[in-house]
């Protein structure tokens, strides 16, 4: 995202660079340095174009990727692809020769597209983080909206419109509003490049606000996961506690006349390890349920039906297991099994959300590292009119900004199982193991 005249390493002002270019001089690079820089720039172009093209092709090859949240990743890939296919190639001869040779019309188009793509890339990062924030903090309503692709398309279009409005009108109309162009012949940069007030306002909307937003979203996701983890652990401790749940606690003891038969039956129902998993649970619950004085029907209704018979007392757990009518213990057992199932579901969702948080943290961190140097140097450079920031530091900062477009496609397969599967399907189909779609665990989904 070139935002300044590409001054030579020894020339701090655009005028001196313009004079050197007008005299036919290059930027002062030796032949060896020119070859090295050209090779590095070509490598960045290839990596950016191929990486993001692979992401876009993955959406064509794998229909499982076409979910609402993944459309936002596609939008980001489109922005990054165009950066590598259009913006960087036009800048390479400019930076190597120090002179723009493509005319004023293409210069305007290049500036509009360059600012548009880089700004939309930042806004897409915000949209992706916001989408994951909703998926974690408002899971029910979020899942209900997953089939509404029109909503996703509207959000994607809004990103492009806002990105254009931030810089596009200023690039196209600044010279007419100011009464003429101040750009020297043979150069291509925005008219407002040294307008500190405009740049601080635009930078606030382009970087500082998005960065604070994604930091807030990811911090909220992290705190939500921590809270749910504590709740799950507390629930597990309560379920494994020495006391049974309230609905399974015994009723007051039966009348003294049958105390002995109840005590014996209950005692024989206690050794859970003698039964299988299902039988042990039923047996244990059954012994407790008989205290309710009528949990179901005839054979298991009440301890008073046996007036002290020891043999009847020993048969009680077996009759409970084979009873034809459900007792209160059956409902309690079903509730416990449901709690176990919910615990596994919650554990899976927590694991998935942790992956989401980690992957977003990586993307956001790289976003900050790539954008912060450029934004800060641009503001400082505008404040001192280009005299307080060495040229090579500034150029390094916006090459770092462009490098973000090459890095983003690498991040997707590292955190997303379906992207890895789609990439394998495209690049190494013979290594793709046939798996049912239901077994895929998504990092983003």
Swiss-Prot record:
Tissue: Expressed predominantly in the CNS, with the greatest expression in the thalamus and caudate nucleus. The various isoforms are mainly coexpressed in brain, but their relative expression level varies in a region-specific manner. Isoform 3 and isoform 7 are highly expressed in the thalamus, caudate nucleus and cerebellum while isoform 5 and isoform 6 show a poor expression. Isoform 5 and isoform 6 show a high expression in the amygdala, substantia nigra, cerebral cortex and hypothalamus. Isoform 7 is not found in hypothalamus or substantia nigra.
Bias (Pro residues) ranges: 242-257
Membrane topology designation: Multi-pass membrane protein
Residue numbers spanned by region Disordered: 237-260, 288-336
Location of this chain's protein in the cell: Cell membrane
Entry-annotated residues carrying Phosphoserine: 439
Keywords: Cell membrane, Disulfide bond, G-protein coupled receptor, Glycoprotein, Membrane, Phosphoprotein, Receptor, Transducer, Transmembrane, Transmembrane helix
Cross-referenced InterPro entries: GPCR_Rhodpsn, GPCR_Rhodpsn_7TM, Histamine_H3_rcpt
GO molecular function: histamine receptor activity; neurotransmitter receptor activity
Transmembrane segments: 40-60, 71-91, 109-129, 157-177, 197-217, 360-380, 396-416
Note: Does not bind to cimetidine and tripolidine. Shows modest affinity for thioperamide, imetit, N-alpha-methylhistamine and R(-)-alpha-methylhistamine. Isoform 4 is unable to bind to iodoproxyfan while isoforms 1 and 3 bind it with high affinity.
Function per UniProt: The H3 subclass of histamine receptors could mediate the histamine signals in CNS and peripheral nervous system. Signals through the inhibition of adenylate cyclase and displays high constitutive activity (spontaneous activity in the absence of agonist). Agonist stimulation of isoform 3 neither modified adenylate cyclase activity nor induced intracellular calcium mobilization.
Family the entry assigns: Belongs to the G-protein coupled receptor 1 family.
Identification of the protein by name: Histamine H3 receptor
